[in-house]
Amino acid sequence: MENLPKSERLRGRSAVSALMSKGRWGFSHGLKYCYLRKDPPEGVNRIMVSVPKRFFKRAVKRNLLKRRLREAYRTQKELLGPSSIDVLFLYNSKEVLDFLSIKEEVASVLKKISDEG
């Protein structure tokens, strides 16, 4: 299993707050997502993944779901293309979904985002 490069991770208070305030929100079956197209394009898409403690009290389950979300994105990131988008994935289901279900949801979200642009 490969890692997501540090350049593709959304980090920093100003970048995250800009995404949350100016970004467009959407919902999918088990995911809530927010995205923001950067202008001018910087050439790299960045993501952030969050699993609320309210749904999963144990850190082990939260970390498992975050790993699954990151891996699902990493294997399908070419669906976005080189469009320079910041994306937040917020896991919004109360049950632990298997990797294939998460991968399908991430694929549908990425297709929605790329079609809107």
Name each model feature, range by range.
Residues M1-G117:
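Positively charged, solvent-exposed patches that mediate nucleic-acid binding
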